[in-house]
Amino acid sequence: VGSEMCIRDRDKGELCVVNAKETDVQGVKSYPSVHDIPETELAIISIPSKSCPEVMEVLARQKGVKAFIVISAGLGEETHEGGILEQQMLDVVNEAGASLIGPNCIGLMNMNYHGVFTQPIPEFHPDGVDFISSSGGTALFIIESALTKGLRFSSVWSVGNSKQNGVEDILEYMDRNFDPVLDSKIKMLYIEQIKQPDKLLYHASSLIRKGCKIAAIKAGSTESGKRAASSHTGAIASSDSAVEALFRKAGIVRCFSREELTTVASIFTLKDVKGKNC
């Protein structure tokens, strides 16, 4: 699915495929190694996790890559050795002055790019919802729920283990680059671990002051939620009362299930009721 969607979007830029066993992937030339590709801006990596640091180093140092989406899993969420590999990946990215989404994620989608390796692929529209999720798998369940309610999306971000960029960082990006005319004013969040509560509070509050509405789930308030969170980040659930206080202070509408989250987002799409009888 991911290759097909990248190929469909290739009119927006040149696409390089690396596959040691193939010379052609769905009509696109395939290179045997990352050493053979031309310089490129973005690398989407889905290979055995033990090979990630070495491949990323070649891409960063020799091919000028400044953005990485790492889909590969089996890293810090599973073992200590996996955590060491993650740190090596981060060191490569930071040394190159690059950006990293992941690992252990499905990546991102927006109106110009749909290169994820899974389904469903929702409809994208400028007036759709911006959705940031710690978990790729849970993001898909939430998207499925949203589709039954007719929700469209402006962007979808899956940050996985959040080695460099987490939910708070994506929210900061949206806040600092917010365009009141062009950008969506509805945000949905699925958060497994709040690593930077001050950043979350500041940028959520700022977006809300700019006219946005934010609904969020904080995983870990139930036993099943705790298991879901630990499967992606190894995170220990935050104090529920602290989460409640943070969300209230920021102005975030707290939800406790995917159905509640997508229902609240659907309500956000409705026009405000005005008039003397309101």
Which residues does each predicted region cover?
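Catalytic-core regions of core metabolic enzymes
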Residues: S3-E4, R8-C278
